């Protein structure tokens, strides 16, 4: 207490200066320790431990040995394997990465827990060893993955060659679609040996069972191929296994005259059809006229097939001269008629004198009936669907029509009614009158006045289409 105020202040200043000096010295010593620790860590990073070196050498040696063994085991395919791609990790890059990791780890340890790790050198050494081991394992895994990727395409290239290792002689009854035959021979076999041609070529049952894989069938195919390729202008006898299709193909190749005959037949059939229609003859008339003229009766179906080119080549060749002669006779008869126009009367009056008149009869024209006459016929049909011969004569005289036309109209009308109403009995010999409602006429529409004449009132329905008179 005997000290003055100024002395107390001086003592406090001296104590503060002493504290500051101690703090500065402690900080300097701490900095020196930090620098020494960093140098030790860097030296550890540069000098790798022998255990880590041994592990890295083992991992690098194993992929090299595996690559050598794989190269020795796999045969050369013609394509050299690509070299191993570099991993992109040099020694300098590895050291820099490790140094950065160590610095960051040391700073993190000092900031978070300065008292937890009294000796940070051991922690940094442990971290360095772990990082080196992880890096070596990563490199080994990358090399193994690259080797597997390189071995996959080589294995896929070798797989297709295994399909052709089985011999063909062990399976004589194998179907052609399932047999592993070369693709280049398939179009030739498809052209020369169709499946249905074995029986047609005259082969037995034992040879018909054979497939293209058997030796005997292959010999027959070789014989057919050599015979077709060495064919000259004169046809040679083919082997027993030659098919009908191959024979026809060789004939068409050897005789170009047949192709011209086919073209001529096609053109003649077209011309014949046009001339026949222009002259007014039907296909049935042509067949009948040819029977009368030349003694060969032909049906309408035969003439139709000739015009449509649906007959065989031989039948077409046999039929062509007869039709050509008939066409010439028809043209000459047209030229002899008055004014050069076709006249059916000139061909029907002299049937016994001139051969041109026996060409056949012409089809009658379609008979057209007026609406009023058709209405009267419908009314008569309602009253009696099957009139007698006398009733037909009276009706034809009253309507000023031909008796044959009226008779044919009633026949056609009965057939039409059968199609419309199948339950009605129109074949009764008495010809009973039918109800007017069955034909769509009301009872008021029928008027039986005017001396027995059948008339149709204005309210009756009419059919405006023409009725064809049959023959």
UniProtKB/Swiss-Prot annotation:
InterPro entries: HD, Homeobox_CS, Homeodomain-like_sf, Lambda_DNA-bd_dom_sf, POU, POU_dom, POU_domain_TF
Compositional bias ranges of the Polar residues kind: 186-196
Domain of life: Eukaryota
Record's GO cellular component terms: nucleus
Location of the protein in the cell: Nucleus
Region (Disordered): 1-32, 149-238
Domain POU-specific: 257-331
Gene Ontology terms describing biological process: cell development; generation of neurons; positive regulation of transcription by RNA polymerase II
Residues in the DNA-binding region annotation: 362-421
Keyword line: Activator, Developmental protein, DNA-binding, Homeobox, Nucleus, Transcription, Transcription regulation
Record field: compositional bias (Acidic residues): 1-18
Biased composition (Low complexity): 165-180, 197-230
Molecular function via GO: DNA-binding transcription factor activity, RNA polymerase II-specific; RNA polymerase II cis-regulatory region sequence-specific DNA binding
Family: Belongs to the POU transcription factor family. Class-2 subfamily.
Role, per record: DNA-binding regulatory protein implicated in early development. Involved in neuronal cell fate decision. May act as an octamer-dependent activator of transcription.
PANTHER family in alphabetical order: POU DOMAIN (PTHR11636), POU DOMAIN PROTEIN 2, ISOFORM B-RELATED (PTHR11636:SF89)
Protein name, per record: POU domain protein 2
Protein's organism: Drosophila virilis (Fruit fly)
């Amino acid at each position: 207490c005997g000290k003055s105020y100024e002395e107390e202040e001086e003592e406090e200043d001296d104590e503060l200066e002493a504290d500051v000096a101690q703090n500065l010295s402690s900080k300097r010593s701490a900095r020196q320790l930090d620098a020494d620790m960093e140098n030790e860590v860097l030296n550890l990073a540069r000098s790798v431990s022998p255990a880590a070196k041994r592990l890295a050498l083992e991992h690098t040696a194993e992929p090299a040995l595996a690559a050598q063994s794989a190269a020795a085991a796999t045969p050369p395919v013609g394509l050299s394997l690509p070299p191993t791609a570099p991993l992109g990790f040099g020694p300098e890059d590895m050291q820099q990465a490790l140094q950065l990791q160590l610095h960051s780890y040391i700073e993190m340890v000092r900031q978070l827990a300065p008292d937890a790790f009294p000796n940070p050198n051991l922690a940094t050494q442990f971290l360095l060893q772990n990082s080196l081991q992880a890096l070596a394992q990563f490199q080994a895994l990358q090399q193994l993955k690259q080797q597997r990727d390189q071995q996959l395409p080589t294995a896929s290239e070798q797989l297709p060659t295994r399909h052709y290792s089985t011999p063909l002689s062990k399976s004589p009854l194998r179907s052609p679609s399932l047999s592993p035959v070369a693709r280049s021979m398939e179009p030739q076999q498809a052209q020369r040996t169709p499946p249905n041609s074995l029986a047609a070529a005259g082969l037995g049952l034992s040879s018909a069972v054979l497939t293209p894989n058997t030796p005997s069938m292959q010999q027959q195919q070789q014989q057919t191929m050599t015979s077709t390729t060495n064919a000259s202008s004169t046809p040679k006898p083919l082997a027993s296994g030659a098919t009908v299709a191959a024979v026809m193909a060789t004939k068409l190749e050897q005789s170009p005259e047949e192709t011209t005959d086919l073209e001529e037949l096609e053109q003649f059939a077209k011309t014949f059809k046009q001339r026949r229609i222009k002259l007014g003859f039907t296909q049935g008339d042509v067949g009948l006229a040819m029977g009368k003229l030349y003694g060969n009766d032909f049906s309408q179906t035969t003439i139709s097939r000739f015009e449509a080119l649906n007959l065989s080549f031989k039948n077409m060749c046999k039929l062509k001269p007869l039709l050509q002669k008939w066409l010439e006779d028809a043209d000459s008869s047209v030229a002899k008629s008055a004014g050069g126009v076709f006249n059916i009367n000139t061909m029907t009056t002299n049937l016994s004198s001139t051969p041109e008149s026996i060409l056949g009869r012409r089809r009658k024209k379609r008979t057209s009936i007026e609406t009023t006459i058709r209405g009267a016929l419908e009314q008569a049909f309602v009253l009696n669907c099957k009139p007698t011969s006398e009733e037909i004569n009276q009706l034809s005289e009253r309507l000023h029509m031909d008796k044959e036309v009226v008779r044919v109209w009633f026949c056609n009308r009965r057939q039409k009614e059968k199609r419309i109403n199948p339950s009605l009995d129109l074949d009764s010999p008495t010809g009973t009158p039918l109800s007017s409602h069955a034909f769509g006429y009301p009872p008021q529409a029928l008027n039986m006045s005017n001396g027995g004449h059948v008339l149709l009132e204005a309210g009756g329905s009419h059919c405006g289409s023409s009725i064809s008179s049959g023959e």
